[in-house]
Design a protein with these regions (language model features):
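Noncatalytic alpha-helical scaffold of FAD-dependent oxidoreductases
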Residues: 1-176
Length: 176
């Protein structure tokens, strides 16, 4: 690009003052399949939950999110929250796991594959995949609202830092 207007049209200003120029872009999108189900896999510790992530990577999951005990505590009084949230051990950690498929038969196969993939590491309690809109939506609402919820619980005068960090997946448990 040589025309200054075209150059300006291809600039992007990101967070923390990042400036980028796009000369070419290709989007790779994720298919939003018709059927969705999610579950909460609860583990004794964050390290154990992190050790499950490499196993889940080998299965047909569409999303995995980690919620530590502080995250769970921040939503346990929500009227839609499961009662067992309030009785979890202080070290508990959960994984919100989602699967998607175009048909029920494929969903069942994916659920079986996920269960088999993580069977070697026990959860605190049995888990079930749910497509029930109320349960499904609460699980994702809880995850998506964490930043504001936890940020609001911090002591006065403190700051909530949010930074992206990356670790090799097989070192995730040790990193936590």
């Amino acid at each position: 690009y040589e025309d200054p207007i075209e150059i300006i049209k291809h600039l992007m200003i990101g967070s923390e003052g990042t400036l980028a120029f796009f000369s070419d872009i290709t989007y790779y999108t994720v298919v939003d399949e018709k059927h969705k189900a999610c579950t909460l896999m609860i583990y004794e510790t964050i390290e154990t939950a992190c050790d499950v992530v490499p196993l889940l990577k080998k299965t047909p999951v569409s999303a995995v999110e980690l919620l530590d005990r502080e995250s769970i505590r921040s939503i346990e009084e929500d009227p839609e929250a499961p009662a067992y949230f309030r009785t979890l051990p202080e070290t508990a950690c959960l994984l919100l796991v989602e699967i998607q498929a175009d048909d029920e038969e494929t969903m069942a196969k994916k659920e079986t594959a996920v269960r088999g993939g993580v069977a070697s590491i026990p959860t605190i309690q049995p888990y079930k995949f749910t497509s029930d809109p109320k349960e499904y939506n609460f699980n994702w609402k809880a995850r998506k609202g964490l930043l504001s919820t936890i940020g609001g619980l911090r002591p006065t005068g403190t700051t909530c830092l949010i930074e992206d960090v990356a670790f090799p997946i097989d070192k995730l448990g040790a990193a936590c």
